[in-house]
């Protein structure tokens, strides 16, 4: 149970409300155009976590009335065949968005695969063109997890402008784009990574701490200042069956002002942000007569 003084950032409740809005919008669009947004999902191999995430995305599509096309490929698929499939999706007028579930097998060049996706269908927001637009504050598809984090903070009226933000993790998927969104919102941002000597130096002075590296209990209560906003993006499956984040929740919630739970925090916001991007892609394509 959360401490009485801390506010839980309930990503599940917010995502549920956004899904209701998306479902309503899609119903109106379908009635007017006789078309529905369609998300293409490519899954390579049988990684259990990837299968779980893909199934969650498909179920979310079903809840809002969005079509999907799932391609499950053998782990030994060649880059050429994978690129050919992406090319087909790029030119298919019935496909609104294309998503390649990561991680990919080692023999596949992930960078090349992501660059092969049409930027106008890159609903994951990983294409270099969309990342470049993010950096220059131009309209683009935002990576789903950072987008979800920002929406969650906005919903709870958490001020970012002028605040000190510490981001733990510098991945291309979360840390880097999230740091840019925070910077664009007027924050002073510090990004910590594997070579950072003393993470506490940054977290103890931060108004907002975001962490997503996959290490249970990495962030302790002693590493935070009282009243800090703590956004836990980590997902860790423990041997006892529990799912936890990167934050020592039971102790951190005693000093934090706001904190996301795991699960039902950032995770649901990631998925609903992906759906939002897919709807945006669909609407843009319809305006262009695609």
UniProtKB/Swiss-Prot annotation:
EC number: 1.5.1.5, 3.5.4.9
Alphabetized Gene3D superfamilies for the sequence: Leucine Dehydrogenase, chain A, domain 1 (3.40.50.10860), NAD(P)-binding Rossmann-like Domain (3.40.50.720)
Transmembrane region(s): none
Pfam families: THF_DHG_CYH, THF_DHG_CYH_C
GO MF annotation list: methenyltetrahydrofolate cyclohydrolase activity; methylenetetrahydrofolate dehydrogenase (NADP+) activity
InterPro entries in alphabetical order: Aminoacid_DH-like_N_sf, NAD(P)-bd_dom_sf, THF_DH/CycHdrlase, THF_DH/CycHdrlase_cat_dom, THF_DH/CycHdrlase_CS, THF_DH/CycHdrlase_NAD-bd_dom
GO biological process, alphabetically ordered: L-histidine biosynthetic process; methionine biosynthetic process; purine nucleotide biosynthetic process; tetrahydrofolate interconversion
Record field: catalytic activity: (6R)-5,10-methylene-5,6,7,8-tetrahydrofolate + NADP(+) = (6R)-5,10-methenyltetrahydrofolate + NADPH; (6R)-5,10-methenyltetrahydrofolate + H2O = (6R)-10-formyltetrahydrofolate + H(+)
Positions that bind NADP(+): 169-171, 194, 235
Pathway named in the protein's UniProt entry: One-carbon metabolism; tetrahydrofolate interconversion
Keywords: Amino-acid biosynthesis, Histidine biosynthesis, Hydrolase, Methionine biosynthesis, Multifunctional enzyme, NADP, One-carbon metabolism, Oxidoreductase, Purine biosynthesis
PROSITE patterns according to UniProt: THF_DHG_CYH_1, THF_DHG_CYH_2
A GO cellular component annotation in the UniProt record: cytosol
Assembly behavior: Homodimer.
Function: Catalyzes the oxidation of 5,10-methylenetetrahydrofolate to 5,10-methenyltetrahydrofolate and then the hydrolysis of 5,10-methenyltetrahydrofolate to 10-formyltetrahydrofolate.
Family: Belongs to the tetrahydrofolate dehydrogenase/cyclohydrolase family.
Protein name: Bifunctional protein FolD
Organism of origin: Helicobacter pylori (strain ATCC 700392 / 26695) (Campylobacter pylori)
Encoding gene per record: folD
